[in-house]
Amino acid sequence: MKLSKLTMAIAIILAGAIGITTLATNSFNSFTTPSNPNDNTVLNSTIDTIDAVVVQPSQLANQWIVSPAEAKYLIEQGAIVLDVRDRDSQTNGMVQGAIAVSWQQFSQSKFPHQGKLLEDELALTQHLRNVGVFSNKAVVVVGDPLNGWGEDGRMVWMLRTLGHQQTVLVDGGYLALSRVDLPMTQTISQAAAIPGDFVIQRIRDWEITQEDLRTRLATRKNLVVIDAREPREFAGATPYGEQRGGHIPGAISLHYKELLDAEGHLLPRSKILALLRDRHVPSNAIIVSYCTGGVRSGWLTSVLVDLGFQAQNYAGSMWEWSAGSANQNHLVNH
């Protein structure tokens, strides 16, 4: 709910009194506590640059996306930083102490299952501990919204699904985070100096398997399927190794980057909700997103959950779906 003008004025006066001089809003409308489509409270902090920001651990249970200032606060309080950008970008600078990771190191390697998480939970646990993931420490994931593939959202979706409920991505990615006076380095680290202690406690709310998707498609009860790929892929192009082209019948085309502005920040919440309404996405639907290998759709799932939607990522996505029988895994070309 929005604060009154009087309350806002008092807040600004008090801020000035303690030396906080810069208040700027990010794309989710400052000083608001957005409601989700079902009127349950979702805490999305919205202060982009402020000298003092406090993020409570309880807030992160529902908040999957943070502003650069909130990320800075979390990092200064000891959060683990995972950098999912490409190596060339990392060479030009990383947050000091960040660990360079890729979504592939936590995923299966054999076609057509490259989008799915490792089946061996012991191996997956060890990989996460090696990069410094602790059960009781926040994890801040840094990506490249403009030039990447939504790897930061994929990483957040993965860790949340595996039971780490203090994992967040930074709105605006590395470029935005580099503007909030954090120490930087050009040294690339791929393993933490102190291994983490994370234990997987899987949460099924945000994932769906191929078999479950087939079942849901047969009834389509309260189901919306979103194709997070480019329009050309939706229409049948196969630039990334899919066995067959097209899209899942009834899917809505929504390229995930439609939710970003020219600087890589998320669009204002109101605009995202309007965009979803225009694509005929009901507020109370269960939304299943897919792409090629669950990366772009993982990002979209993270954003949708942060907004308060019931959202699931089909990690197998088109690599797996298109490799299945055409009689079972139908595709539409147009």
Please place each PLM-identified region on the residue numbering.
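Short hydrophobic beta-strand that contains or immediately precedes a catalytic carboxylate
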Residues: 71, 80-85, 101, 225-227
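Helix-loop module immediately N-terminal to the HCX5R catalytic loop
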Residues: 108-139, 256-286
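C-terminal soluble interaction/assembly domains
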Residues: 272-274, 282-334
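Gram-negative bacterial Sec-dependent N-terminal signal peptides
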Residues: 6-22
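Active-site neighborhoods of enzymes that stabilize oxyanions during catalysis
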Residues: 54-64, 74, 175-249, 326-334
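Signal peptide processing junction and immediate N-terminal pro/mature segment
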Residues: 19-49
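Thiolate-centered catalytic microenvironments shared by cysteine-dependent enzyme domains
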Residues: 4-7, 39-42, 47-55, 119-207, ...
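N-terminal module-boundary/linker segments of secreted carbohydrate-active enzymes
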Residues: 43-80
